[in-house]
Amino acid sequence: MVSPTQITPVHPDVLHALKICQYHDPHGVYGWHEVDAERAVIRTRHIGAERVETLLSDSTVVELAAVGDDIFEAIVDHDASCDYRLRIHWQGGQVTEQADAYHFLPTLGDLDLHLINEGRHERLWEVLGANPTTITTAMGDVEGTAFAVWAPNASGVAVIGDFCGWNPSQYPMRSLGSTGIWELFIPNIGVGTVYKFAIHTHEGHRLDKADPMAKRAEVAPATGSIIASSSYTWNDDTWMTNRAHTDHDNTAMSVYEVHLGSWSQGQNYEELATNLVDYVKEMGYTHVEFLPVAEHPFGGSWGYQVSGYYAPTSRWGTPDQLRLLIDAFHQAGIGVIVDWVPAHFPKDAFALGRFDGQALYEHPDWRRGEQKDWGTYVFDFGRNEVRNFLVANALYWLEEFHVDGLRVDAVASMLYLDYSREPGEWLPNIYGGRENLEAVQFLQEMNATVHKSHPGVMTIAEESTSWPGVTSPTWEGGLGFSMKWNMGWMNDTLEYFSHEPIHRMYHHNDITFSMVYAYSEKFVLPFSHDEVVHGKGSLWTRMPGDAWNKAAGLRTLYAYMYAHPGKNLLFQGQEFGQVKEWSEERSLDWGDMDGWEGEYHRGIRTLVQDLNALYKDSPALYSQDNNPAGFSWTKSDDAANNILSFVRYGADGSKILAVFNFGGADHPSYKLGVPEGGNWKCILNTDAGIYEGEDNYLDSDVMAWDTDWDGYQHSLTVHIPAMSGQLYRWEA
């Protein structure tokens, strides 16, 4: 060994910059460096070490000299030191042996860096964040974790955690040039380790940030990221194969929307994999939709203010337990849709906001970068790396969790620059308009990428305006979504039902108007969580009248939804008419169905169960949802009696007549025109006793005769009980 005094010293300014984590190239100081053709220097910093030795590849052991500030160094033989290990003698007597974190090449290649800066890296989670990695060296395999983070405005970045006493001086990262990415491979750190990134700004501030790409996070209110790697073995090959060939336009889709923390409070992902899956299967739904399951700091946001886009929330278990839940749904024949929130994110100091001291993920101008109503930041959709972060995140949930659909939240807030903004609070686009052109491009790219890479996966827009082409293909200039929530239908329908039956005749347009635009987009009919919060009450309380009328109203409402063109969605608890408004802080009120007082609620639940079974067995109710040939009115103008009827036509030639009486009077002999003569069989009556109805006028078969009526060549006469709906199947 050569004395350290013969080593050219590192400049004090560099050592100081390293100590305060404001140096871009720690690998240029620490690690192994050639001195001349025969010698090399090994230099390392280990805070709290008493002695450090290096074990060379020829089995030589060399002690490194302490040169101050926890730095140890020695000159060693060049050939024997190309690979080495460090033996660290810590204060207190502990001895550890490890590879040197500063003796490895970058774990990101040039192609990775190019794709990231172009915004085109579709597997971003495999190269950024914390990825457990094994690197093969001359002295054997080295297990550890490759860390990488995008922080282009930082003056220095370090990995911190219990493994270094949360001291950023121990593991500063290197900057990979103009890419803005900082990288470091740390040996002997693996799955389960809590970590953060210490971001140092040019203004001298230190920001301890959770990893934007973390695959697991601590349970809130803790904010650390956790190194994670999946060991889950999927058992849904058949489901995934069949999904790729599914045409959702022409298949049944009945969605049960769920907040996992309140469906039955206290259950984790693994318990829900039995209890929730069994319930959804028993009820006959085709799909379940989770309110956001990405990590979020505030439970009261229901998951819509995301801090960890790649980390399933730890409130209800581990990422692999979530995989188990989704797998269980697939094995039960049920698809899984997840709410996804690319519109905005919270301002919590540990998360994405001002990530490297400046606006990074958010737009730098507050007139585009903040959503004042929600107190959140808005993503900078025009920035390549940000767009890549979001598109890759969509793919991540599809790839890593086998999710079958993404319901994209708050799309309208993305599309319009003046969304919920007063004059002077927004910036127009380059053409002077209010359309957010960058957000449009992002949504088109996301949808095109998802549909190309994962055939059969759905993307569903929550879009509350009349923006054209939401569900039109991107190659036609549309946004490219598979479906769109029909907010207009939902608002008009609930407004109509909120009136006393005697007054509904004055609001008849509310219940018929939806068919004017029913085929302008591909729609989902949503009675979602948004309709049972913020003082709106439950669907039960929004029905007028006493308990009998409320129950009859809900039964009729649900039958109308299932018969109307469009896919169906119902939020948890509404399937049995929960009385109280929903709260994320408590379980559903399953007790509403108990005892004699619960008979109406049990009846509603039975009706929804029967509607799901009937719906799935009736192509007329779903196979032409997006084809005008799948629908015709048979009575749309009887406002005085609050009666509505129409026929749904299946692609297989089947036909179902839907008849609704939204009023309070029975109609024992009501004549309707129909497209076919012969027998029409009653397959559902919401007034039946099994649903706790009055059991009045229960037709089983009705004959249509060759008598012209209302423009049809055939007609029939039906009994229509007050506040009820009936479905009749044509049997020729």
UniProtKB/Swiss-Prot annotation:
One of its GO terms (cellular component) is cytosol. Its EC number is 2.4.1.18. InterPro entries: A-amylase/branching_C (IPR006048), Branching_enzy (IPR037439), GlgB (IPR006407), GlgB_N (IPR054169), GlgB_N_E_set_prok (IPR044143), Glyco_hydro_13_cat_dom (IPR006047), Glyco_hydro_13_N (IPR004193), Glyco_hydro_b (IPR013780). It comes from the Bacteria. It is an enzyme of class 2 (transferase). The keyword Glycosyltransferase applies. SMART domains: Aamy (SM00642). Pathway: Glycan biosynthesis; glycogen biosynthesis. Signal peptide: none annotated. GO terms for biological process: glycogen biosynthetic process. GO terms for molecular function: 1,4-alpha-glucan branching enzyme activity; cation binding; hydrolase activity, hydrolyzing O-glycosyl compounds. It catalyses: Transfers a segment of a (1->4)-alpha-D-glucan chain to a primary hydroxy group in a similar glucan chain. Keywords: Carbohydrate metabolism, Glycogen biosynthesis, Glycogen metabolism, Glycosyltransferase, Transferase. The active site is at D409 (nucleophile), E462 (proton donor). The keyword Glycosyltransferase applies. Transmembrane segments: none annotated. Monomer. Catalyzes the formation of the alpha-1,6-glucosidic linkages in glycogen by scission of a 1,4-alpha-linked oligosaccharide from growing alpha-1,4-glucan chains and the subsequent attachment of the oligosaccharide to the alpha-1,6 position. Belongs to the glycosyl hydrolase 13 family. GlgB subfamily. This is 1,4-alpha-glucan branching enzyme GlgB. The gene is glgB.
